[in-house]
Design a protein with these regions (language model features):
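Long protein-protein interaction modules used by eukaryotic assembly/scaffold proteins
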Residues: 1-59, 64-205
């Protein structure tokens, strides 16, 4: 379906999943999780970004972000989180995209305004390294989505998502805001979460 023939919610969902695919790639590059040759400099929304080109890495990022399309369109997705773990699978850093798509918005979507707003997120990501934490060499990472309500059990796309087994922090996390935007029909925040300095060493499962 041509993007212009979609509802505003469908249009914004398509733009968002394309943006999230690039943003996740930039985050993973920023953290130095893979050799630089796994990425390639590209221009997206007139910003130079690092796009994953390693086949397995690129496929994982693409499938997880595009898999969110129908749920973002329906307003079901509350947060998309890139979580980095230590070897015990305990989260040590989270990049959180908290989003809300106005389901009653019926006006024509100005994609130029939306892309201008999203471009600012990518620019912020390129300079976010000083507020991040170094990662252990034996760690791991994943993309996790948090839903406002669960999709229907018979939803074929929903069956591609499985519950996460990530351990939880016992204390409220330390939050570092990176960027926020309110551009109807989209509201989105990007922030970092780190464990509290008083966090117990063995979080609950």
């Amino acid at each position: 379906m041509d993007r212009r023939s979609r509802t505003p919610q469908g249009q914004i969902a398509q733009v968002l999943v394309e943006f999230l695919e690039v943003a996740v790639s930039c985050i993973v590059f920023l953290k130095g999780f893979y050799p630089p040759r796994a990425f390639e400099r590209r221009r997206y929304m007139n910003v130079v970004v690092q796009k994953a080109v390693h086949p397995e890495l690129a496929s994982y990022i693409h499938s997880t972000t595009t898999g969110l399309l129908p749920f973002i369109q329906k307003g079901l997705v509350e947060r998309v989180v890139v979580i980095f773990y230590d070897k015990e699978h305990v989260p040590i850093e989270k990049f959180v995209f908290k989003l809300s798509v106005n389901q009653s918005y019926g006006s024509k979507l100005e994609e130029a305004d939306l892309e201008f707003a999203l471009r600012a997120f990518l620019i912020k990501l390129t300079v976010a390294e000083p507020v991040t934490k170094s990662l252990p060499s034996d760690g791991s990472w994943e993309v996790t989505a948090y839903f406002r309500s669960l999709p229907s059990y018979g939803d074929r796309e929903a069956q591609l998502w499985i519950p996460t087994d990530a351990k939880l922090w016992m204390q409220a996390p330390h939050i570092t805001p990176i960027k926020s935007v309110s551009c109807d029909p989209l509201k989105m925040q990007l922030y970092l979460e780190h464990p509290s300095p008083t966090e117990p060493k063995n979080p609950a499962a």
